[in-house]
Amino acid sequence: MKPIRFFKPENLQLAKAILARYPLRFQSAALVPLLDLAQRQHGTWIPPTAMYEIASLAGVSIDYVHSLILAYPNDFFWRPKKPRVRICNSWMCQQAAEEQGNSNWDSQCRSVATKYGFDVENTGCLGNCFQGPAMWINDKIYGVNTKEKLVDIMEALTQKKN
């Protein structure tokens, strides 16, 4: 029986390029980038066909791939109906927001993001402390945020989506 291919030909080439970065004995280290590639191709979650193909490419068991997905449920098993905004809730970002006069940054962010149809969740430090308050939308981290900047970002993202 011929295995079912999950990756499109162009993404299969990317997957092979990702694997080529790692020595043969350590190709399991490529699992997170491969899962990310599969998620980008499929949408928002990792289907079983992708797990099987990734396991085959990396030379690991399907159980190993599945256990890695279970270790990162918010990244690989989450099936959002809407895009999401992750707000950094570290004390550095909270202090930066206070210094900018945004003492209620979290609630401002939530009200603006939900108005534009985004889900909002808190996250740990985004490593952008020098530009707080920080937030993470899709693959980009935004820093030195204000309510006005957030509105501009939301409008740009919703226009790009339409």
From Swiss-Prot:
Binds 1 [2Fe-2S] cluster. Belongs to the complex I 24 kDa subunit family. The keyword Metal-binding applies. Its cofactor is [2Fe-2S] cluster. It comes from the Eukaryota. InterPro entries: NuoE-like, NuoE_dom, NuoE_N, Thioredoxin-like_sf. This is NADH-ubiquinone oxidoreductase 24 kDa subunit homolog C11E3.12, mitochondrial. GO terms for cellular component: mitochondrion. Keywords: 2Fe-2S, Iron, Iron-sulfur, Metal-binding, Mitochondrion, Oxidoreductase. One of its GO terms (biological process) is cytochrome complex assembly. The keyword Transmembrane helix does not apply. Its EC number is 1.6.-.-. It comes from Schizosaccharomyces pombe (strain 972 / ATCC 24843) (Fission yeast). [2Fe-2S] cluster binds at residues 88, 93, 125, 129. SUPFAM superfamilies: Thioredoxin-like. GO terms for molecular function: 2 iron, 2 sulfur cluster binding; metal ion binding; oxidoreductase activity. It is found in: Mitochondrion.
